[in-house]
Amino acid sequence: GSVAQVGNGTFIWPVPQYTYCSRWYSSGHKGVDICAPAGTPIYASASGVVTRAGYERGGAGTGYGNSLIIDHGNGYSTLYSHCLSLTVSAGQAVSQGQLIGYVGSTGRSTGNHCHFEIRHNGRYLPPQNYFNK
């Protein structure tokens, strides 16, 4: 479904009506890619504070492009990248389901998608283990 229990919190799928087109792999791909047309809205998976928002070239070939990280507390955070544009900025508090950006293909990307990661205390968690997409 579009709602998942992660730790003590409830997270929602950030790009409703679209599923992932590339899954999490332990070696290099630390999230899922949600393929959707350019300009499709992306929503905050859970409430929190935006800790980083902007264009990231990244090291080691990450190249997240327009991306943001939301700190949800209790060691949990989510990352959304390759966005066409962002609607929030660092330091801003966001609510679950709030518009945070739009699907795009910025940075090291081969097509329109939202790269979505869930992290807990610096560890990457495979989103497909929590969402039935």
What are these regions (language model features)?
Residues 23, 36, 52, 82-85, ...:
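A residue-level detector for short acidic-glycine micro-motifs
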Residues 1-66, 96, 125:
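Surface-exposed, glycine-biased beta-strand/turn segments
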Residues 53-54, 92-99, 130:
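Extracytoplasmic low-complexity repetitive segments enriched in small/polar residues
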Residues 40, 78, 106, 110:
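Ser/Thr-centric signal marking residues that sit
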Residues 34, 66-70, 95-109:
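Short hydrophobic beta/alpha edge segments that flank linear recognition/processing sites
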Residues 45-90, 112-120:
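Zn2+-dependent peptidoglycan hydrolase active-site motif and core
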Residues 77, 119-133:
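Short peripheral tails and domain-boundary helices/loops at the edges of structured domains
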